[in-house]
Amino acid sequence: YQTERLLIREIFADDFEEIWENQIGSGFETLEMLEAYTKEQYRFYGFGFWAVVERESGNLIGVAGLTLPREWKGEGDWYSLKLPPPEGEERYFEEPLELGYHIFPPYRRKGYAKEACLAVLDYGRHQLGVFHYQAWIQRENTVSQRFAAQLGFRKKEKACQGF
């Protein structure tokens, strides 16, 4: 998937260490677990986390993608986005998928997160037939809360249990 400034592609083996070093692997106990999950996610689900690459430089600048909702530790809240399906569009997932992203620190505050997340949501809607999304955001992360609101997400009163 391409945007004006970004290439959003599958994560390659050469990307694992850079992703791990930038603390994306927080949901995984080891680098090997991150590698195993990433290698199987596309084949098993048809979606997952993708590498976000700056087109001009070719640099890996973060990750963004869709996952099945999961239990998160810590203090946080679920945010939800429901898009209307286009007329006659088939719905593949009745349950929401979770939107996640992480832009590496040197590339923040340049609009890359919004550009990447909008592309991921577009892919989900038009390629996967997904019209309901959620995001889990830590309560103290007011920047991500405002960002989610910019994307159209609204805080849920009760947490979704996922699948």
What residue ranges belong to the model's regions?
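Active-site rim helix/loop that mediates acceptor-substrate recognition in acyltransferases
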Residues: G27-F49, E54-R55
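Acyl-donor (CoA/ACP) binding surface of acyl/acetyltransferases
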Residues: Y1-F28, V53-F163
